């Protein structure tokens, strides 16, 4: 699928990725045009001639971003296509991808931070995910922190996603929940996400939520936040905690 503009200055392209057990799930690459006119690419996907040309028509690629320790399979191809771009990745990815030269490690500060606020999700060392809030469009970009898979993906994968709680709504799968090693740290990180201004959710896996995304994200994260004492600046975040 080619690039599709979802709002001013933001484009997405979907591809299908095969995982373990033969499961195939949709994945999304997001391209953001910065105020400089340069491009910032989140979770690069397959980069054939046609897609590289489409991206080139939008502007010069300045940054390639691998947002966690699993979203890197197509990074070398993107580097080959856009050799002048800086590569920024989740902490620890440089050990998994010694074939890629990294310009920086994702954290709370970034050269694009005025437009795309990075928020590291602590307490999940298996993923080391960093999510981003695109301030101009009010969009939250996530990789594996949240899914929104609603389309049928075949009997096996749909059944698996239902069993792991990652199907039919904005949700965190049980696989990700099991990856939490420091619950207070993870909860504090997710609360920082909820304190940011966003209305749209752009996940790597699943449907985009165009409006009202914050409420959906609150519901998905409520299991993690239920015991957290919220700071005064977060009192406006009303998290509904379900009985479990």
Language model segments and positions:
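Short, flexible loop segments at the rims of nucleotide/cofactor-binding pockets, characterized by
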Residues: 17-22, 39-45, 63-67, 116-122, ...
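A short, highly charged, low-complexity intrinsically disordered segment
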Residues: 225-244
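Short His-Asn-centered micro-motif
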Residues: 42-45, 65-69, 89-91, 121, ...
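Active-site environment of divalent metal-dependent phosphoester hydrolases
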Residues: 48-49, 70-74, 94-97, 148-150, ...
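Conserved beta-strand hairpin/beta-sheet module of binuclear metal-dependent hydrolase folds
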Residues: 3-50, 130-134, 138-143
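Metallo-beta-lactamase
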Residues: 2, 7-8, 40-41, 88-129, 135, 181, 185-188, ...
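Active-site HxH/HxHxD metal-binding segment of metal-dependent hydrolases
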Residues: 53-112, 222
